[in-house]
Amino acid sequence: MNSAVTLVDFDRLLNGLDHIYSEFSRACGLSDCAYGMLVDTSTAGGSIAVSRLTSEWFYSKQTINSAIKTLTARGFATLEYAEGSRKNKVVSLTEEGRRFAERYALPALKAEQRAFGALEPCEQREIIRLIGKFSQVLGDECDAFKQHIAAESQAENQGEGESCDC
């Protein structure tokens, strides 16, 4: 019997983790992105620069802005220019947002911390190391893929308009 782990096994594991995180956000009545923004803003002390959210999350700026709009529409956050800036914005939790985060988001975060804490310290370091290595290599492969596609597209575009004098 073959006991080798396959990429399909790994993908299923990652999909399962994504599903669990989605269950946390769904239980709070928020999208995955809005939930993440709420947790990050709360753990940052109640205010966080939008630029920090966009640099630390792998969502598009449009998705992050939509999530922030949801939080502001529900009365959980405000969005204002950073002090002394006419460009950079800061998300701040309202009192209602702080209460919501304490009641729903932070207990979910504590559950995640307990799950990570169930791993031995050497297991914690190993999982971080391995996932970091996999992410780096996959990111490099993605960059190479995008360069290949761009080169193919450019070659196809250069070929357009050329005619054959047959």
Regions inferred by a protein language model and the residue ranges of each:
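C-terminal regulatory/oligomerization modules of transcriptional regulators
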Residues: M1, C122-C166
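N-terminal leader segment of winged-helix/HTH proteins
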Residues: M1-C28, E162-D165
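Charged, amphipathic alpha-helical coiled-coil/dimerization segments
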Residues: K69-R129
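Short, hydrophobic-biased segments on the C-terminal half of alpha helices
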Residues: V50, I68-K69
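N-terminal helix-turn-helix DNA-binding core of bacterial DNA-binding proteins
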Residues: H19-T63
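Alpha-helical linker/hinge and terminal dimerization helices associated
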Residues: F10-L13, L17-Y21, W57, F100, ...
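Pre-recognition alpha-helix immediately N-terminal to the DNA-recognition helix
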Residues: D9, G36-D40, R99, E126
